[in-house]
Structures are given as structure tokens and as C-alpha cells.
Amino acid sequence: MASDHPASRVQRVRHELRRRDLTVLRVDTPTPGFRRITFTGAELAGFTSASFDDHVKLFLDAADGGEPVRRDYTPRQYDAAAGTLAIEFALHGDGPAAHWATQATPGQRATIGGPRGSFIIPTDFDWHLLAGDETALPAVARRLEELPAGTRAFAVLHVAEAADRRALPSAASVQVQWVDSGAALVEAVRALDLPGGEGFAWGAGEAGTMAALRRVLVDERGLDRQAVRVSAYWKQGATAHHEHIET
């Protein structure tokens, strides 16, 4: 069991902010509602992603010829030796990034920026809670792959379509609960039988749902605010929304 206060063990690391022009190498469909696009290119040299919580900006040409569309995505897997970066796209809604991912083919060009920095959560907490919707699934999957044997983790995931509820490989001991709505996600976390010891809770998804989740974790369940990291990856009725939720 870790003895230091969580705030003293979480690391915030800054990275050189660069844009990189890349090429689509491969397009895979892990489940019907997702595309996994693998990029390559000489400009990937020096790319860094130190945390599953990281995000890069994807720049896409606007349909009206105006300013490029910008959307945030998790670096799902970076292979420095192979010179590849994989990003998974949740195909929810009809936005420009989902449309681009649906029609992407090998040889297409794309530009990414970042990550600007990393919020590094140690793996040696007594337990880890990961909660989110489809947009958080790539980050959750990456985190579970990174957790070592002997670690205990709980994942509560709002993924409405059964076909998109995939296996989540991990060396850790993982309890996964799938739910059908944001409200059900919050309720499931409220009812979750968490163990003793020092844990860390991470969540990402729709802004309103994540605000409610943070209130449950901090106000109702009594978790230390420094042991909770909740972010809005999108907001109902808004575009290009991404924020860390503090209250």
C-alpha cells in the first residue's frame, strides 16, 4: 500500500508542443461503433505519451474551407520502434471527426498536435476506479493494459450497444460493469463496493454526467479530491468540448 498523499505522487509533466503531419497506415474496426486508425510518418520521431489520460488534437479540413476542425483524442498506442501511433474513434453522432474516421483509408494525410502534457497516475494504488462512456473507452482500455499483475481495478462503462462491449485485456484483477446510460453509470458508481486502502478514481465522458460522477465520488463517497480525476470529453449541445472538472 502506498503511504504518500495522492497529490504528492501524481506527476504533471509538460511536453514540447509540436504539430505532426502523418499518414494513415491501417484502419481497423475493433467493434461496429469504433474505428482504430494507425498513423505513421517520420514526424512521429520524438512523440511522447506518458499517460492514458493524455490527449492529442486532430486537425481536419473544414467542409466550408474555413479554420481547421480540432478534436481531442487519446493516444491509444504508440510504438516508437515501429514508428506508429494508433487512435480509436468512437463513431457516436455525425460530427466531422467521426465522419472522417468512417471514410479514412490508408495513404490519407492527417495532422495531430500534442500531447501538451501528461497527468501520470501511479499504478501502485491499492485499487483503481475507471468510469466513462464510449469516448473514454480507448483511455480505459489503455490503462487496463498498463496495470500490472497484483493490481485491483473496477471499470464502470456506459456503452449502449452490446456489440461495442469488448473484452478489456489486463494483467490486473478487473471487475467490469457495463451500463446503458449516463445516469446508470453514476448510480453504479454510487453503489459500488470499493475496498479499503488508498485508491484513485478516474472518469471521462459527457460533461453533465461527469459533474454528477465527481459529486458522488467526493461528496457522497468521501474520496480525497486529490485522488479523483474527472474530465468532460464532450458536452450535450456543444462542439469540441474538453475540460477537467474540479467541482
Language-model-detected regions and their locations in the chain:
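Extended, composition-driven regions rather than compact fold-specific motifs
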Residues: 1-247
